[in-house]
Every structure is written in C-alpha cells, then in structure tokens.
Regions:
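C-terminal motif of bacterial Sec signal peptides marking the signal peptidase cleavage site
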Residues: 15-18
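Bacterial signal peptide processing site
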Residues: 20-23
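Early extracytoplasmic/lumenal segment of secretory-pathway proteins
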Residues: 25-109
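A structural signal for short loop-to-beta-strand junctions that line the ligand-binding cleft
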Residues: 94-99, 117-148, 165, 175-178
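Ligand-binding "clamshell"
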Residues: 110-118, 129-136, 244-260
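A bilobed periplasmic-binding-protein/Venus flytrap-type ligand-binding module shared by bacterial periplasmic
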Residues: 147-154, 268-281, 300
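Periplasmic-binding protein-like
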Residues: 172-180, 291-315
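Ligand-binding pocket segment of bilobal, Venus flytrap-like solute-binding proteins
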Residues: 181, 185-187, 191-260
C-alpha cells in the first residue's frame, strides 16, 4: 500500500542552520529575505516537523525560524496524505511536534483520530475565524486557488469552459490532466462531494475519466507538461504556473484560467499547520506556528511563492487576481477529515491512476 512504500523512501533530516554555535552566522538566499540579521545562539528548544509542504517552498521559512530563534529544527518531508497516514500509525509514539499540510483534509483526518493538540488563542487570533478550525486544532497560513492551467498554443480563454463540470464535454476528450493522488486535489474533491453530494461528484469524476483524462502525480508536473505542450490543460493550484512563468518566461507556454467565480473549480484551499497532542515541545511548536503568520513570512509566501497571505494586514502580491472565487468561509473544512478517506477511495475507484 501507499504508506508502506512511503516508509521505505522518506528520511528524517536534521536541518542545522547555524543554531547553537558560539559564533552567530547569517542566512543567505531566500531565507535571508525573511530574516536578514545574524543568527541567534541555541536556545535549548527543539521542534520536529512533518512537512507536506514542498521542501523548496517552505525550507527557507524553516531556516529563518531556526536562525532567528535559535531553535533546533528537524524535518521529515513527504506528501501530506502519506504523512497523515504515518502519524496515525505512529500515534502517541511519533517524534513529530508539528504537522504542516498542503491542505486541511489530512489535518482533519488526524483530528478525527484525536491526535491533534490545542493551539493557543494568541496564534489563532492572527487569522480570520474562517481560516482556523472551530476546535482550535489547526490554523491556515496561506491560500491557493484552484485553476485550470492551459497551453496557450492550443487554447485561448474564450475557448475554455465556464465550469469544471464542462470538462466532460467530448470536445475536451484526452486533453485534461488530473493530479489524482495529490493532497490538494483530494481535498478539493472532498469539498466537491460535500457541496454536490457523492453521486454527482462521483459521476463527474467517472465522466471525466471516460473522457480520457490523463493522470499526473502532482500539480507541478501538470504545469510543466502544459507549458511544453505535452498536455492541453489540467486542474492545479494557481501558484505553480506563476513560479514556472517567472523561472522560464521565454519558453513556458501556459497560463492559468479561472472558472466562474462561484464554480467549485475556483475553490480557495488553504495550507494548514497544527501541533500533535503528544508533543513534548509545546512551546517551540507554538513559536513555529506563530512565526508562520508573521508579516515577513507572510510576505515571503505571497512575493516568492505566489500564495495568498492569510494573516491580517499583509497585502497579496499584485500579480495575483482578486479572490472572487468560492470563498473558504462558505466551506466547512472541519468536515474534510471525515470525508478524506472516502474521497480517496472514490478517486482510486475511478481508474484515473491508471491513465
């Protein structure tokens, strides 16, 4: 099964960021954009993070946190889904203090297993009420909008559909890519089920698979494939294409397209952070969660990774479109944990993973 495969491949990496030494050091690269000062000496604290966020996106933030606070940081990288399954298997014996998820579903799954601790009100109050769980067990720290990325040589905006439901039309046969095992896609599909019912959601997925949809393992692989013309379009998070355009402006031939404002295909999905109930490093865990919502880190997320900031007072990158999509406040993300496993089962049963 997927968990067994994961356990043989993921490694626990200790990130030594100049903490605890007698001579303070400074950061370079993207981490220096968050904290440009000298690193603190070791403070005696440590925190172990299981991160479903991609290493190249979140690692500069963790480096800056370790540098600024002097906290010893250890990280285990993996997919949000697999890490959530691993945490459930480890239970109270886990080394993890903090779990960073690409989306709320895996966090909701852990909440349903009573594995999450209570986050302090001083951290929860840094975001709007709809951006943390009602029970106070997770907090959002950035937002990603679901979009359709498309190859500009093959399509123009006026030829694209108004709704994600229209992708089952025969004129899009063999042209749509889906990241079926990706955590944010599974979360999105869980909301789809919640909004429209299991029968309608399952029928849509089966219809799009019957329309010869193609499977890719993640958002980035779809964006790259669309940019080189390997696939015509695909369902992804918005920020991957911004990053690809910034890195390869002359060769990448893909743009984002938003469905109608209230379409389920334009859902805003948030990244979520939580701490484990079994954590013995509660103070360091709270420090990290609060750090994710500081202005420099939130600015980094929107300026460098093109995500939507969630902390009050931080202005989104001017390149990002206004958030007129299906708003997160209209979706009860606390329900995602309960539907997470069922949504994954429906995705697997659809046959998309064999495409």
């Amino acid at each position: 099964m997927i968990l067994r495969t994961f356990l043989t491949t993921v490694l626990l990496a200790s990130l030594l960021f100049g903490c605890g030494g007698s001579d303070p050091e400074s950061l370079d690269g993207r981490a220096a954009e968050i904290d440009g000062g000298e690193c603190s000496g070791g403070n005696g604290k440590s925190v172990t993070i299981y991160s479903g966020r991609t290493e190249n996106l979140i690692n500069p933030v963790l480096e800056a946190f370790a540098c600024e606070t002097g906290t010893d940081v250890q990280v285990r990288w993996g997919s949000s889904i697999n890490l959530a399954l691993l945490l459930n298997e480890e239970g109270s014996k886990t080394q993890a203090d903090v779990f960073l998820s690409r989306s709320p579903g895996p966090v909701g799954y852990l909440e349903s297993k009573d594995l999450l601790g209570q986050i302090g009100e001083d951290v929860l109050s840094l975001v709007d009420e709809q951006n943390h769980s009602a029970a106070g067990t997770w907090v959002g720290f950035s937002g990603r909008k679901r979009v359709l990325v498309y190859n500009t040589d093959e399509f123009s905006p006026e030829t694209l559909p108004d709704s994600v439901f229209d992708l089952t039309d025969p004129k899009f046969k063999g042209k749509v890519a889906i990241p079926g095992t990706n955590g944010s896609f599974v979360d999105w599909f869980t909301v789809f089920i919640d909004q429209y019912g299991e029968e309608t959601a399952t029928q849509w997925l089966n219809d799009i698979v019957d329309n010869d949809a193609k499977y890719y393992p993640n958002n980035r692989s779809i964006v790259e494939a669309a940019g080189r013309g390997e696939i015509s379009m695909g369902l992804v998070n918005h920020y991957y294409n911004y990053q690809e355009v910034a890195a390869n402006p002359d060769t990448h031939k893909a743009l984002n397209y938003s469905f109608n404002d209230n379409d389920i295909g334009s859902l805003l999905v948030i990244t979520a952070a939580t701490k484990l109930a079994s954590s013995e490093n509660d103070e360091a865990a709270e420090d990290l969660l609060a750090y994710l919502l500081t202005a420099p880190v939130q600015q980094y997320f929107t300026d460098r990774t093109f995500e939507y900031p969630l902390a009050a007072g931080v202005v989104p990158n001017a390149a990002l479109p206004a958030l007129t999509a299906l708003e997160i406040g209209s979706v009860d993300f606390d329900k995602l944990g309960g539907g997470f496993e069922e949504a994954s089962r429906i995705v697997e049963a659809s046959g998309i993973l064999n495409r």
